[in-house]
């Protein structure tokens, strides 16, 4: 007699816990419920340039403000690369420079390829 009610309660418990686990999965996948569970909710970066424009306008620089890094330097070709751990800065002459991905090449390989391309050899 006692087995049927226990089986029914156990089945109900399994169904409820499975449903709750599924809803938690969907909440996490679609970003819902984070603040309710006490997790810090980080705001994603904006898809427009408003943050960049505010930061650019608020930067104080009496020389040249680099557009990629917002660094204040004496000349545009002195601007650092935004990602120096994976990029090399290559000066093109006439006060201009570009940052190129190293891509696993040997040191100086990116600069060599750019120079070959400028000469029309690549």
Swiss-Prot record:
One of its GO terms (biological process) is ERAD pathway. It comes from the Eukaryota. This is Long chronological lifespan protein 2. It comes from Talaromyces stipitatus (strain ATCC 10500 / CBS 375.48 / QM 6759 / NRRL 1006) (Penicillium stipitatum). Belongs to the LCL2 family. Keywords: Signal. The lineage of its organism: Eukaryota, Fungi, Dikarya, Ascomycota, Pezizomycotina. Residues 1-21 form the signal peptide. InterPro entries: LCL2 (IPR034543). Probable component of the endoplasmic reticulum-associated degradation (ERAD) pathway.
């Amino acid at each position: 007699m006692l087995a049927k009610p226990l089986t029914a309660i156990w089945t109900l418990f399994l169904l409820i816990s499975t449903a709750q686990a599924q809803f938690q999965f969907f909440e996490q996948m679609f970003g819902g419920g984070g603040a309710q569970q006490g997790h810090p909710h980080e705001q994603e970066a904006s898809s427009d340039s408003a943050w960049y424009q505010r930061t650019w306008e608020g930067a104080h620089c009496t020389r040249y403000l680099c557009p990629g890094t917002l660094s204040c330097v004496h000349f545009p070709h002195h601007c650092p690369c935004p990602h120096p751990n994976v990029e090399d800065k290559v000066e093109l002459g006439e006060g201009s420079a570009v940052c190129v991905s190293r891509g696993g090449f040997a040191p100086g390989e990116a600069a060599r390829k750019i120079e070959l391309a400028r000469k029309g050899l690549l």
